[in-house]
């Protein structure tokens, strides 16, 4: 298996792919996926002809799988290959490639699992769900504007950054084992458990949260800000825990 360079030609084309109901997406390509949660399931590909022709989309049950025909595809030049996708529900997104995933609408689902193993980025708007899992193993970045859920799990194993700009949840678990940074603002979260075993930095901003357990075993630094009721810390690594901007409101 080897990749080939595909230079964009001048012929811009659109292709509609007929699909049934799906709620999971897997991409192993350089294509950018733009998702909208809607009433129907649809797929539309836009790009230069050579790129569109080389993209293969198959449906395995409730999973939509994006691959390339023949050898791998690496896009050369300024052109991008874009896939516009809509579905009534989305529960899983897996990216292993240089392509990006962007949710162009809010997401309302029972559970959402997102895993990024490539160099592409994942951008989410507001997510409303019971459980969410964001896992970053690659060099790309994961960013969520707002998450409202019962249980949130964040795991960073790669060199990319993971940021959640506003999290409302009952319980939140964050684990940083890579060299990237993990930033989150948490509002009204009753119980927070966070561990740092890597070289990246962990930055948590609390807004009227309950208890937080912080475990530092790596060389990265932990910065805690905002308001908590109780805080428990454990430090065995070479990094520092900065709580100078944290207030405990008992």
Where are these regions (language model features)?
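Glycine/small-residue-rich hydrophobic helix-like segments
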Residues: 176-177, 183-217
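Extracytoplasmic/luminal low-complexity segments enriched in Pro/Gly and acidic/polar residues
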Residues: 213, 217-225, 229-232, 239
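Short beta-strands and strand-coil junctions in structured, solvent-facing domains, enriched
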Residues: 33, 101-102, 121-122, 141-142, ...
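Short active-site-adjacent structural elements
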Residues: 204, 223-224, 242-243
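Intrinsically disordered, low-complexity proline-rich tandem-repeat tracts
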Residues: 95, 116, 136-137, 156, ...
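Acidic (Asp/Glu) and glycine-rich low-complexity loops/linkers
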Residues: 1-116, 123-135, 143-155, 167-173, ...
């Amino acid at each position: 298996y080897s990749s080939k360079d595909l230079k964009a030609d001048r012929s811009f084309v659109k292709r509609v792919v007929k699909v049934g109901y799906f709620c999971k997406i897997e991409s192993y390509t350089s294509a950018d996926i733009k998702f909208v949660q809607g009433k129907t399931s649809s797929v539309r590909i836009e790009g230069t002809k050579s790129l569109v022709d080389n993209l293969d989309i198959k449906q395995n049950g409730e999973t939509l799988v994006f691959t390339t025909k023949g050898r791998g595809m690496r896009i050369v030049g300024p052109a991008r290959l874009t896939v516009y996708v809509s579905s009534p529900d989305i529960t899983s997104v897996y990216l292993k490639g240089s392509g990006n995933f962007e949710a162009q609408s809010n997401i309302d689902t029972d559970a959402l699992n997102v895993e990024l193993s490539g160099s592409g980025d994942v951008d989410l708007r507001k997510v409303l769900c019971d459980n969410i899992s964001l896992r970053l193993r690659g060099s790309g970045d994961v960013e969520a504007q707002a998450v409202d859920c019962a249980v949130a799990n964040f795991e960073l194993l790669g060199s990319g950054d993971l940021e959640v700009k506003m999290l409302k949840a009952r319980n939140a678990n964050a684990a940083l084992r890579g060299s990237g940074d993990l930033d989150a603002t948490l509002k009204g979260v009753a119980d927070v458990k966070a561990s740092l075993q890597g070289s990246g930095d962990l930055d948590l901003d609390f807004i009227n949260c309950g208890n937080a357990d912080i475990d530092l075993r790596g060389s990265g630094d932990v910065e805690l800000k905002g308001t908590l009721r109780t805080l428990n810390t454990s430090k065995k690594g070479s990094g520092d825990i900065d709580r100078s901007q944290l207030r405990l409101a008992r």
